Amino acid sequence: VFYMDNSFPESWKKYIKAGEEEWKDTFERIGFKNAIVAKDFPVNDPEFDPDNVKFSCVRYSPSQVANAMGPSWTDPRTGEILNASVYLYHNLIQLVHDWRFLQTSPADPDARKVILDEDVLGNCIRYVVSHEVGHCLALMHNMSGSAAIPTDSLRSPSFTQTYGTTYSIMDYARNNYIAQPGDKERGVKLTPPKLGLYDYFTIQWLYTPLLDAKSSKDEVPTLSRWITEKSGNPVYRYGKQQISSRLDPSSVEEDLGDDPVKAAGYGIQNLKYELAHLSEWVKDTD
């Protein structure tokens, strides 16, 4: 259970809940129904304390920080997750607005606003919460999530409606800056997926009960076989986040597709379009 802070703006709450519970389906596929449930902070319950490690929460922080985080605390003896909470700082809304505006406004009139409509902003919040819940479930960043996608497939309605912008929500692949003016009308999806194929596989690997195994060592052959079965498929590749040196060009932040030069070309075209139209988009705002 993730308990949702009652300090959140009311308009955010259904999107936060959706982001939390998106991971339900990954667990249902391995036999756990309602493994993740979102609830409001209990009212008039003397046993509830959001600062108690017994309760995993989604907390609101009225801060100028434009970010979110999803830390967890584990038992070092077993790896059991004892507590996993998501923290959303208020200025997160500025961050997701800027992503949505800069990355998709050429293709999406709904993004050409100083203040995004509730559903557009809400779905940005949903994406962030889902990403942070992934961290709570022990998934690290996978910066190769989009590297297996042919760049031009990100302008395909059928492909993007199925897969979004990346094969893993744990990637830093935000919105579809490959899409060009007119692509939304053709059906191209401009936002990240709910969850990707990599995410489903990782939950399977981490949490599937291997009932015949009598010890953790007995699980190794099955877990190794699952990895071997996927090892030749770049869709399931894990790309470690590179903190200092960027030695692997297929595992970097904020990129899209398998061809960074072509992707950058599309992105630059969009930036030029924005510069040419920015004044008319914001002329009626303060």
Question: Which residue stretches match the model-derived regions?
Answer:
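Divalent metal-coordination and catalytic microenvironments
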Residues: 23, 79, 138
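Short, flexible loop/turn elements at secondary-structure junctions
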Residues: 6-8, 40-42, 62-64, 78, ...
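Conserved catalytic/binding loops enriched for acidic/polar residues
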Residues: 146-286
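Fold-level signature of zinc-dependent metallopeptidase catalytic domains
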Residues: 1-45, 49, 88
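The catalytic-center signature of Zn2+-dependent metalloproteases
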Residues: 40-61, 123-180
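Short pre-active-site segment immediately N-terminal to the catalytic Zn-binding motif
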Residues: 8-12, 111-129
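Active-site-adjacent "gating/activation" loops or surface patches in catalytic cores
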Residues: 1, 58-67, 71-115
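Extracytoplasmic/secreted envelope proteins and their assembly/folding machinery
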Residues: 17-20, 122, 126, 268, ...
